[in-house]
């Protein structure tokens, strides 16, 4: 049996739920509400990686979560970013205030959607 025949009987995967968070400046960050088991294990393993400082380890964990969970980022007055490369690039370019807001949003999101994971 060919690949096409096998795929016909399969249902499409449902979209993961999403949650939107709005900053005081009006930016909207949309985060995915589902994470695979492999991603959860990868995130847990980050806690055991030797880093130069506690700050380095914290930054790695925040960036990892952002990369895996960010779906869309609407910045005031611009087209929304939806491509993974664009989202990560903009995160790396973010100001200290934007990073603080993102960290707080990730903590809130983890508490609501992934209470079993340790927030950075």
Identify the meaning behind each predicted range.
Residues 14-26:
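Short acidic-hydrophobic surface loop/beta-edge motif
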Residues 32-120:
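Short, surface-exposed, charged amphipathic helix/loop patches that serve as local interaction elements
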Residues 29:
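Short N-terminal binding/cap micro-motifs at the start of the first secondary-structure element
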Residues 1-14:
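Short Lys/Arg-rich cationic patches that frequently serve as NLS/NoLS or arginine-rich RNA/DNA-binding motifs
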């Amino acid at each position: 049996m060919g690949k096409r025949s096998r795929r016909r009987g399969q249902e499409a995967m449902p979209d993961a739920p999403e949650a939107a968070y709005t900053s005081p400046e009006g930016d909207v960050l949309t985060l995915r509400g589902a994470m695979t088991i492999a991603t959860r294990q990868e995130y847990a393993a980050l806690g055991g990686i030797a880093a130069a400082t506690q700050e380095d380890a914290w930054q790695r964990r925040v960036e990892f979560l952002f990369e895996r969970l960010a779906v869309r980022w609407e910045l005031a007055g611009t087209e929304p970013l939806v491509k993974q490369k664009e989202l990560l690039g903009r995160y790396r370019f973010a100001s200290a205030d934007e990073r603080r807001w993102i960290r707080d949003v990730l903590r809130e999101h983890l508490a609501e959607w992934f209470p079993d994971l340790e927030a950075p």
